Regions:
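Active-site and adjacent substrate-binding regions of carbohydrate-active enzymes
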Residues: 1-580, 584
Length: 585
């Protein structure tokens, strides 16, 4: 391993915020796809650094960087060949250090992906393991003389991999892989493997990263007679990682990627009796496809049901909520019937399918319907958890289903209507992927520059919504209460944290809908619309009636009775009044 740099000085105690991730708005950005600083056609760390002012303006609190390590790039960088090296196309360790410092200067934290389950078959560890079975790396991977062990482990990539075992002609044994055959699984029963992973984590923590997204954690161990997922040994290793991080660093976060049912995922938070001793955060995978399902069916039950079946989590922990990311819209956590329904509704062209999912971006999934995009974004920002945006969704970027695998949702960021969308000065043929030139989603129409100039654009709307979320701690820290309501097409809930009470009402139907809600707990309060400041009628004993436009929503602050007098006059008017009084004195 490379020598780690000196750890940065910790922030003063008074500036610490150990649970910053609960309030944060996360933003996933592909280094390769964001901005090219040197004209070679590939995005890089310096290009990303140059765009930090934009991300700060947007309101991003934390960047999530998928793998930028040395890699053959057969799986978007998730086939890592050096966990402490930067892919030369992306820059150097010094470039990363400068990027990290520039992000921190702007108040933006950075978490990075760590692929613990597997490596590339080009990793020196695997090359040594296959060529010298009795050497120091001989047991770093899971080897077998036949391919019959662990028959209960499902094949994840059913459209490309016939088995979880692949024969290696050099070692003349089979090696185990839960993902692609070029990604052999590490053998965590070998103590040296765990030590090597923690050493790699320490390298990046010493550089100053604010945490990690732990990729594919349910599959670290294998045991006969099991499906090889969520095993006790996996949790023990995560506890070890958490202890290591907590004992040596402050305010760092571990975000778990476990595409499982919530009842299994909550185990990755650890022991609730001690406030959680594994991961601080975990993605809520099942809620994501059900948002799409609920809006298409115009029924709230897919969302309300999965949230009702989500167990409580430790107070210090948080869900990560997302709509889209760098992978396909995964349909693993739905029934076969629901999967067929989602494919029929959202992937009418076979090219839109990938593995057990849909390889499309948010805007095309929603037919570029602004009302639906805004509704989905409002749900993303308001549901219990921290929202994770995917780069380009704030401007409604499209996809390219003509590209292979998941590359269709990983095209270059569209900055301007100029050549290469302002992403790179390279010849178009040298770009890592072609820019989107679609008549609707293409860079000539959909780009940051044009939407920055238009204050009515999706970009400005998204920025305003992020600002509103930040002004109301109930969204990040508050409790969640599903209100039900008289109309099954309307999904209504309350987020509450201290005196901050927010009523969120969402019309999942394309038609205008009325709803009556039981709000007697806040009788006499006068709700205030958060975005425009409009006052609504006072709540009484009778059911509270609201009418919403098609795919419309309300965010209403419910002031407590003691707050009513203070909020009767808008803040701007109060300032004007005080100014005029002093002028006349």
């Amino acid at each position: 391993m490379s020598a780690a740099p000196e750890p940065p000085a910790h922030a003063p105690e008074e500036h610490r915020d150990p649970e910053w991730y609960k309030r944060a708005v996360f933003y996933e950005v592909l280094v390769r796809g964001f901005a090219d600083s040197n004209g070679d056609g590939t995005g890089d760390l310096r290009g990303l650094t140059d765009k930090l002012d934009y991300l700060q303006w947007l309101g991003v609190d934390c960047l999530w960087l998928p793998p930028f390590y040395s890699s053959p790039l057969r799986d978007g960088g998730y086939d890592v060949s050096d966990l402490t090296g930067v892919l030369p196309e992306f820059g150097t360790i010094e470039d990363f250090r400068q990027f990290l410092g520039a992000a921190h200067d702007r108040g933006i934290k950075v978490i990075i992906d760590v692929v613990m389950n597997h490596t590339s078959d080009q990793h020196p560890w695997f090359q040594a393991s296959r060529s010298d079975p009795h050497g120091p790396y001989g047991d770093f991977y899971v080897w077998s003389d036949d391919d019959t062990r662990y028959p209960d482990a499902r094949i994840i990539f059913v459209d490309t991999e016939p088995s979880n075992w692949t024969f290696d002609p050099i070692r003349k044994q089979y090696y185990w892989h839960r993902f692609f055959s070029h990604q052999p699984d590490l053998n965590f029963d070998c103590p040296a493997v765990g030590d090597a992973i923690i050493e790699a984590l320490a390298f990046w923590l010493d550089l100053g990263v604010d945490g990690f997204r732990l990729d594919a954690v349910p599959y670290l161990y294998e045991r006969d007679g099991t499906n090889g997922e969520n095993l006790p040994e996996t949790h023990e290793f995560l506890k070890r990682v958490r202890r290591y991080v907590d004992d040596r660093y402050t305010d760092r976060v571990l975000l778990c990627e476990a595409n499982q049912w919530p009842g299994d995922v909550v185990e990755y938070f650890g022991d609730p009796a001690v406030g959680g001793d594994e991961c601080h955060m975990a993605f809520h995978f099942p809620v994501m496809p059900r948002i799409f399902m609920a809006v298409r069916r115009e029924q709230r039950y897919p969302i309300s049901e999965v949230l009702d079946r989500t167990p409580a989590i430790p107070d210090s922990c948080q869900w990560g909520i997302f709509l889209r990311n760098h992978d396909e819209l995964t349909l693993e956590m739905v029934t076969d019937e629901e999967r067929d329904y989602m494919w029929a509704e959202y992937a009418f062209d076979p090219r839109m399918k990938a593995n057990i999912g849909i390889r499309r971006r948010l805007a095309p999934l929603l037919d570029n319907d602004v009302n639906r995009i805004e509704l989905f974004t409002a749900l993303l920002l308001a549901l219990p958890g921290s929202p994770v945006l995917y780069y380009g969704d704030e401007i409604g970027m499209g996809d390219n289903i003509w590209l292979g695998d998941r590359d269709g949702v990983r095209t270059p960021m569209q900055w301007t209507p100029d050549r290469n969308a302002g992403f790179s000065t390279a010849e178009p043929a040298r770009l890592y992927l072609p820019v989107n030139m679609d008549s609707i989603y293409g860079y000539q129409v959909t780009n940051v520059e044009s939407q920055t100039r238009n204050t009515s654009s999706l970009l400005h709307w998204t920025r305003r919504m992020i600002q509103v979320r930040k002004q109301n701690p109930a969204f990040g820290l508050g409790s969640f209460h599903d209100l039900g309501g008289s109309n099954p097409s309307v999904f209504s809930f309350v987020r509450e944290f201290g005196d901050d009470i927010v009523l969120c009402v969402n019309n999942l139907s394309r038609f205008p809908q009325p709803v009556e809600l039981d709000l007697r707990d806040w009788e006499s309060a006068e709700p205030i619309e958060l975005i425009g400041g409009t006052r609504f009628p006072a709540i009484g004993e009778l059911p509270y009636l609201l009418t919403l436009s098609g795919h419309g929503f309300y965010w209403l602050r419910i002031p407590r009775p003691t707050q009513q007098v203070r909020q009767v006059v808008p803040e701007a008017s109060s300032v004007d009044f005080l100014t005029e009084s002093r002028a006349g004195a």
